[in-house]
């Protein structure tokens, strides 16, 4: 995926001692996204706004807060996370590359 005429913040968002890294992208329409990579491990993220996570490469398992269901996602798939919630994401082998879109 390409973002034409977008603003990219050069300073990275670094989480979990560098195991999750992303960069903020603001499109010409004003949409805020992050483009990043998750190294193998298990991590929990909270949400303020609703989010859509698109998996670009690799795979992961996700458990949304308030559920016990584990969903598997791979390249070409996406999952939504409600606002004021969160999710636990597990990456097992290769890094998982993603685009996170902030909704609403």
Regions of interest found by a model, annotated:
Residues 47-62:
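Short, conserved beta-strand element in jelly-roll/cupin
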Residues 29, 66, 91-93:
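A generic beta-sheet turn/junction motif
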Residues 26-48, 80-83:
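Conserved short histidine dyad/triad with adjacent acidic residue
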Residues 67-84:
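Short acidic-glycine-tyrosine-enriched beta hairpin
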Residues 1-31:
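A short, N-terminal "cap"/entry segment at the start of jelly-roll beta-barrel domains
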Residues 82-104:
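Ligand-binding loop in jelly-roll beta-barrel domains
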